[in-house]
């Protein structure tokens, strides 16, 4: 269930992240820094109210939102977008409207958080392990 996402997570593996960042327009210098980072995500859930704090050694971003309600989001790379989140089965889906549109999903499978990032025909998979 989506509530299993609550907690603190650290990146364990990443596939196709550089291609995803290129597809959303991230410049080379920022891509190099992001590829070298090992982010943590701290997810808090209170009913339909969620917050996600993503931290690296060079940047921290916080988003707070209510499931089903559109909100303004500034992404880690500085893009300003409109986002709506929803629950789909055991996953929390972020539908990001900007230039370009993208979809991020988070779901716990086998005790790990699987984060799938999609833009156009590019798919990135990032696996996080729970931090005790």
From Swiss-Prot:
Q: Which domain of life is it from?
A: Eukaryota
Keyword flag ATP-binding? no
The record's note on its domains: Forms a beta-barrel structure that accommodates hydrophobic ligands in its interior.
Q: Which organism is it from?
A: Doryteuthis pealeii (Longfin inshore squid)
Q: Which family does it belong to?
A: Belongs to the calycin superfamily. Fatty-acid binding protein (FABP) family.
| Tissue-wise expression | Expressed in the optic nerve (at protein level).
Quaternary data:
Interacts with Na(+)/Ca(2+) exchanger NCXSQ1; ReP1-NCXSQ phosphorylation does not affect the interaction.
Known function: Binds and may transport fatty acids such as palmitoleate. Also binds poly-phosphoinositides including phosphatidylinositol 4-phosphate (PtdIns(4)P), phosphatidylinositol 4,5-bisphosphate (PtdIns(4,5)P2) and phosphatidylinositol 3,4,5-trisphosphate (PtdIns(3,4,5)P3), and phosphatidic acid. When phosphorylated, stimulates the activity of optic nerve Na(+)/Ca(2+) exchanger.
Q: Does the keyword Oxidoreductase apply?
A: no
Q: Name one GO cellular component term.
A: cytoplasm
**Phenotype for residue 20 to F:** Does not affect activation of Na(+)/Ca(2+) exchanger and ReP1-NCXSQ phosphorylation
State what protein this is by name: Sodium/calcium exchanger regulatory protein 1
Q: Which GO terms describe its molecular function?
A: lipid binding
Annotated binding of (9Z)-hexadecenoate, by residue: 126, 128
**Impact noted for substituting residue 128 to F:** Loss of binding to fatty acid. Fails to activate Na(+)/Ca(2+) exchanger. Does not affect ReP1-NCXSQ phosphorylation. Fails to activate Na(+)/Ca(2+) exchanger and does not affect ReP1-NCXSQ phosphorylation
Query: Where this protein primarily resides, as one coarse class?
Result: cytoplasm
Effect of substituting residue 126 to A: Does not affect activation of Na(+)/Ca(2+) exchanger and ReP1-NCXSQ phosphorylation. Fails to activate Na(+)/Ca(2+) exchanger and does not affect ReP1-NCXSQ phosphorylation
Which InterPro entries does this one have?
Calycin (IPR012674), Fatty_acid-bd (IPR000463), ILBP (IPR031259), Lipocln_cytosolic_FA-bd_dom (IPR000566)
Record's comment on post-translational modification: Phosphorylated. Phosphorylation may result in the release of the bound fatty acid.
Its localization reads: Cytoplasm; Membrane
List keywords of the entry alphabetically: Cytoplasm, Lipid-binding, Membrane, Phosphoprotein, Transport
């Amino acid at each position: 269930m989506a509530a299993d996402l609550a907690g603190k997570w650290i990146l364990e593996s990443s596939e196709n992240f550089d291609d995803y960042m290129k597809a959303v327009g991230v410049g080379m210098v920022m891509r190099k820094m992001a590829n070298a980072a090992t982010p943590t995500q701290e997810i808090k859930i209170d009913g339909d109210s969620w917050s996600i704090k993503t931290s690296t050694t060079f940047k921290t971003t916080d988003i707070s939102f209510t499931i089903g309600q559109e909100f303004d989001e500034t992404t880690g790379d500085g893009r300003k977008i409109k986002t709506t989140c929803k629950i789909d089965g055991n996953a929390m889906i972020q539908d990001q409207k900007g230039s370009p549109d993208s979809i991020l999903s988070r779901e716990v499978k086998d005790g790990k958080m699987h984060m799938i990032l999609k833009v156009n025909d590019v798919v990135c998979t990032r696996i996080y392990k729970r931090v005790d």
